Amino acid sequence: MRKAIVYASVHHGNTEKLVKGIAEECQVDLIDAVKQPDADLNSYDMIGFASGIYFSKFHQSILEFAEKNLPDDKKIFLICTYGGSANYKTIEQILDKKYSTVIGKFGCKGYDTFGPFKLVGGIAKGHPDEKDIKNAVEFVKGL
């Protein structure tokens, strides 16, 4: 079964750290939505979308990528890193339009210095850590 993870990691590299850890242990292709906005997903059986959470949403590049490039009727898994809380609503709205089946979701804390968090030196320092990466690897292996 061919798997890909389409990701965006634009501020502190939290999501990239997580998906690269997954790729070291699992057979998945990594696609950077910012650098490869036109990547073809047709040959993949299972597709993951991974992003930090920005204003309670996946990064705009992920939302645009899914809207434009995701073929209908695919098995999907979702991964997010966050300072506050996980939120999958906006990406799930796009996936619903594409008749996709979400087979799993994984989220973990990620270092965040946005807005008021910057005043206190950020939150979730050191995350994702080795335990977070191990849990993400186990999540993908279990799909």
Residue ranges and their predicted role:
Residues 3-4, 10, 16, 24-29, ...:
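FMN-binding flavodoxin-like domain, especially the glycine-rich phosphate-binding loop
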Residues 27-38:
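A short beta-strand-loop structural module common to alpha/beta enzyme folds
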